[in-house]
Amino acid sequence: MVILLGPLLLVFMLGLGLAPLSLAKDEDRYTHFLTQHYDAKPKGRDGRYCESIMKQRGLTRPCKEVNTFIHGTRNDIKAICNDKNGEPYNNFRRSKSPFQITTCKHKGGSNRPPCGYRATAGFRTIAVACENGLPVHFDESFIITSQ
């Protein structure tokens, strides 16, 4: 019996050791999500805004075709991952309330910098993928405009 418990204990201890690694990975994915899609207080919401922020965030090597920035608080965005401001939507969570957003679309041409972008500002509900209560992926294809 003692011999059987040894390997079980080892597996249990390894599992405990891997849990922090998994949480750290989720934090990294959340940080990446924020870098790509979060801008609390945009300075203007036109083409120059898009060209500037896309370059600052490292999204122009190569020029990213489409990227949306969410303007709100981190807590409001995180709340989509629970029932406070989110609801299930396929494999994602859809926000119950609209967010102010800016979508930057590449004007075309070369995918090498300098990248030109068109900005579309608006309010809409958004869909995100969540892991351990944190948003880790923004669904660019989900578009429902608010009334």
Swiss-Prot record:
* Residues in the signal sequence: 1-24
Motif Nucleolar localization signal: which ranges? 55-59
- Which cysteines pair up through disulfides? They are 50-104, 63-115, 81-130
Q: State whether keyword Cytoplasm applies.
A: yes
Q: Where is this protein chiefly located?
A: secreted
Catalytic-site annotation from UniProt: 37 (proton acceptor), 137 (proton donor)
Q: Which GO terms describe its molecular function?
A: DNA binding; endonuclease activity; protein homodimerization activity; RNA nuclease activity; tRNA-specific ribonuclease activity
Instruction: Give me the Gene Ontology terms describing cellular component.
Output: cytoplasm; cytoplasmic stress granule; endocytic vesicle; extracellular space; growth cone; neuronal cell body; nucleolus; nucleus
What does the UniProt record note about how this protein's activity is regulated? Has weak tRNA ribonuclease activity by itself due to partial autoinhibition by its C-terminus, which folds into a short alpha-helix that partially occludes the substrate-binding site. In absence of stress, the ribonuclease activity is inhibited by RNH1 in the cytoplasm. In response to stress, dissociates from RNH1 in the cytoplasm and associates with cytoplasmic ribosomes with vacant A-sites: ribosomes directly activate the tRNA ribonuclease activity of ANG by refolding the C-terminal alpha-helix. In response to stress, the angiogenic activity of ANG is inhibited by RNH1 in the nucleus.
One Gene Ontology term of the biological-process aspect is: stress granule assembly
Name the top EC class. hydrolase
Binding of tRNA occurs at 45-46, 104, 126
State the EC number(s). Answer: 3.1.27.-
Supply the Pfam families for this chain: RnaseA (PF00074)
The entry describes its oligomerization and partners as:
Homodimer. Interacts with RNH1; inhibiting ANG ribonuclease activity. Interacts with PCNA.
Alphabetical list of PANTHER family matching this protein? ANGIOGENIN, RIBONUCLEASE
What protein name is recorded for this chain? Angiogenin
Organism, scientific name: Sus scrofa
